[in-house]
C-alpha cells in the first residue's frame, strides 16, 4: 500500500509522483491501494498524482483503489468529473 503525506499541493506533487511511481513498479500484488487518509492540505495536484498512479497501475495490469480519500478531495474529484476513477478500497 502506498501512502500520501499530510500535504499534497503543487509544491510537492512532482517529487511525490516520482517517488510513488517507483513504488508502483515495485508493488507485486494485483491490487494497488493508495492510503490518502493522512491528507489534510491539498489542491487539485493531489488528484493529478492519484490519476497518474491509477494509469500506471492499470498499465501494469493492476487494479487501483484509494483508501481514506478526504471528503473535500472526493468533492473536488466530482467537480472535475473523475470521482468514479478513484474507487474506494474495501
Model-identified regions with their sequence ranges:
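STAS-like cytosolic regulatory interaction modules
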Residues: 1-45, 52-90
